[in-house]
Structures are given as structure tokens and as C-alpha cells.
Amino acid sequence: MTGTSNIPTHGKEHKDAPALLPLPAPNPHHTHAAHPGDPSHDRPPSRGKLFIKTHGCQMNEYDSAKMADVLTTTEALELTDNPEEADIILINTCSIREKAQEKVFSQLGRWRALKTNGRDVIIGVGGCVASQEGETIVKRAPYVDLVFGPQTLHRLPDMIRARREQNRPQIDISFPEIEKFDHLPTPRAEGPSAFVSIMEGCSKYCSFCVVPYTRGEEVSRPFEDVLTEIAHLATQGVREINLLGQNVNAYRGAMDPGPSNNTNPAAPPYADLGLLIRAIAQFESIGRIRFTTSHPLEFSDSLVEAYRDIPQLANHLHLPVQSGSDRILSAMKRGYTALEFKSKIRKLRAVRPDISISSDFIIGFPGESDTDFQKTMQLIEDIGFDQSFSFIYSRRPGTPASNLEDHTPDEIKRTRLEHLQKHINAYAADISKRMIGTVQTVLVEGPSKKNPNELTGKTENMRPVNFPGNPRLIGQFIDVHITEALTNSLRGRVHTN
């Protein structure tokens, strides 16, 4: 493998950062419903149980958490892991892969029996399949009570009420831009690491992707609203912030035109991701900042400068490239060439030489030749990608790529995928092995799932580390000496000087 080693170092130094912005005081009226969602307030007795099943990306996980927040707060529902005892059952769907709709209807069919035993169980379908299918879901599965899109989950209490009063299905798959964030309860931390959605949708319209059609075009949350949510989380012990968006580095958050902006005509009307990261870094208790998922077109010099100046910005970047062939990238409508992608990585490594870079790859895109695939493999060799995601192309109805002819046999696609994954996994394993003997900064997240007598956390380059330690370390950043590299994790011991 050529290029940089990608092994993170401990105690790295960065150039002095410029003066930053004053932080807002927590103000739940900026972005959230008033105090009923505040974790400091007692909840009323449970009025039923709620089950949520989530498919798909981290944004869906975030949305499901917000559904739970809304319904446990406003409807006094209690979460359950058992759909058979639930009064409300929701499935948050993903449409990124082929046959997603069939999987949803199959799951709904299994739940149908829960409505036939005399219980008034409400079944709802949310997420991207709901946005795509709309009324078709109710026509095909008339026992479904609610159909709602990613942008209307905050309306669930009203939809449930209307369903019970009118005794007919409720459908709302509209795109009310950023409205949902104005009606969500104050965020509740579930541990030392928290996700914060800063923008929704995507306006890039890659030829293979359904996101612009299911989540709408790019809409950014106001700058101060994001900081207010983070301020609430920081008061609850959150130490790591994960910024979310379908195209997160396209963030353009409107800034409050306060006195500083009035006296400075050159002040920007919005904050980009780099400026937002600088503002988050001013929270003393926030020790690590991450963001996902990015688009290479939006990977700006401002973001490179943030990596240069902000030590809290994790030494890891996930930047989906999809292919190393310019011909395929053009057919995908990605808007960049392989050389332009490498140029962005070169700029980043000039300020963070040891940064870990992961990516996404689509194999078997219509028309992909052996030469195209070899160019992808060459890019992998040139960059030295760490842990990455790779998939065989999945034709999505309604996207431009779904009309392209595809003559490549499935067997060849599978062979290419296996070849690519073998190389990516080898690179990742090599990086893990070379971390043995190093000292890594780890955010302790809680007990290990496999051994509750041990603790677990993540390194900056997203590797889980399991190690013996005192539970009082949970929620803290500690130094861990890495002693062993396993297939999907590391082992270590607490480092003492």
C-alpha cells in the first residue's frame, strides 16, 4: 500500500486557531418544544407502550430516537422491545437498497395479526419508503394506520389523535423544510456520545440515489439552533458530538443578524460546516467532534482549515468516492474526477498527515468494465482507505441510472466486490495491527457488550477498544495502551505514566 500510514498518533499538536464566536446560552425555545421534554421534569404515568423498528442509516437512527422522544413526552408512552405488547408500532424504513419495499410489507404482514385480537394497536410506517410509496402502502396494507415521511415525524401525536378520532388512516409525507426541529422536545442524552442532525436532504441528484426524492433537497438548520441543542446535550454529560446530514458538509446554517453582523458588512450570512465546528469546539466539555456523511464536491478549504486548527475534530474522515473511474463517476453524476478527489485528500493530509480515511464504493454500476473496476482498485491503492463500505449497485426505480443498460453478469459483480473487500479489509487489518503498542485517546462509552466486566470505547479512527477498567471512567476521555488487534476491534489497558 502506498501513501500515508493512517496510524493515529497520540498527543498531536495543531496550529493556533483564530478567535471564535460567542456561544449562545441554552434556549429550548430556539429549536425545541418547551419544557415538557426537558429531562429534569417528571413524566406522567405511562399510557401505553411504543415499539420502533429502524432500518438504514444513522440519520434514521437519529429520527427514530426523536420519534421516541416525541411520543414518550407528549403521549406518555413507554418504550418496549417487544412488538406484541406495544400499543403503537412504528417502522422507520430505508429505501437505499433494492427490494426495500418488499421487506417492509413482509414485516407489516407479520404485525397484522397483532391487530386481530381485539386490541387497538396502531401501526405506522415512516422513513424513506413511506415518502416513496405514500398512499400505496395503505392500499396494499389497509391495516396500516399512519404513513409519515422523515420531515413530518414531529406530527405523530396529531396523526395518532386523528386516527383514533376519525378511525381512518392518516398520511403525511410532505416536506415542510426544517419545521420538525422547531417542534421536537429538548434532547435527552443517552450516553457520552450524541448525534445532532444539522441539515436534511440532498441537492446533488446522483443518478443512482433516491435521497433527493425521499428526503427532499438540502435544508440547513439555523446555526444558533444547532448550538442550542449541543448546549443542552453538554449539560447532560455528552463529550462527543456527531453531526449528521445526508450531505453534511453542504451545511449552510443561517446566522442570527446580531449587532456583530450589523457592524461588520463582511460577516457571512450563514455558517458553513467549518465555522460550525469551530463554534462547537468552544464548548469546554465537548472533547471530540465528528461528522457524516460527506460529499467530495463540498469538501472545502474551510473544512481543511478546521482540521488544521481544531484538535477536537476527530482524526478520521468518511468521504464516499463510489468509483475510481472518471467515466463511471460521470455516469453517476458525482461532479468530480478521481484526480480531483485525490487532490482534496492531498490537501487534507498536508495538515493531518496521519488521518484515517474511509469511503463508500458502488460495484457493478451499469456499464462498469474491467478497466473501470481496475481504476477503482488503483484509487484504493493510491489513497490507502481504512474501513469502508462497498455494495453491488442496486437499481432504484425513478432514478436516472435505473434506465441505463446493464450487461454485466451478477457473478462478475460479486467477484469484483469480493476482490475489493478483500483489499480494503487487508488495509484496515494492517492499520489495526500497527496500532499495537501505541497509546490512543478513547471515549469510554460504557460496559463491553461481550464482557460486562470490561469497558468499551472508540478511538479517533472509529475502532472499538475493550479493556478492563473502573466503571467510573464511563463518559471520560482516557489514554489506552493498545495490546491486541482483532478482526473488528482492539484490546488494551488503561495507560498510566
Curated annotation (Swiss-Prot):
Residues 433-496 form the TRAM domain. It catalyses: N(6)-dimethylallyladenosine(37) in tRNA + (sulfur carrier)-SH + AH2 + 2 S-adenosyl-L-methionine = 2-methylsulfanyl-N(6)-dimethylallyladenosine(37) in tRNA + (sulfur carrier)-H + 5'-deoxyadenosine + L-methionine + A + S-adenosyl-L-homocysteine + 2 H(+). PROSITE patterns: MTTASE_N, MTTASE_RADICAL, RADICAL_SAM, TRAM. Its cofactor is [4Fe-4S] cluster. It is an enzyme of class 2 (transferase). GO terms for molecular function: 4 iron, 4 sulfur cluster binding; metal ion binding; N6-isopentenyladenosine methylthiotransferase activity. Pfam families: Radical_SAM, TRAM, UPF0004. Its EC number is 2.8.4.3. [4Fe-4S] cluster 2 binds at C202, C206, C209. Residues 48-165 form the MTTase N-terminal domain. The keyword Glycosyltransferase does not apply. InterPro entries: Elp3/MiaA/NifB-like_rSAM, Methylthiotransferase, Methylthiotransferase_CS, Methylthiotransferase_N, Methylthiotransferase_N_sf, MiaB_methiolase, rSAM, rSAM_horseshoe. Keywords: 4Fe-4S, Cytoplasm, Iron, Iron-sulfur, Metal-binding, S-adenosyl-L-methionine, Transferase, tRNA processing. PANTHER family: CDK5 REGULATORY SUBUNIT-ASSOCIATED PROTEIN 1 (PTHR43020), MITOCHONDRIAL TRNA METHYLTHIOTRANSFERASE CDK5RAP1 (PTHR43020:SF2). Belongs to the methylthiotransferase family. MiaB subfamily. This is tRNA-2-methylthio-N(6)-dimethylallyladenosine synthase. It comes from Xylella fastidiosa (strain M12).
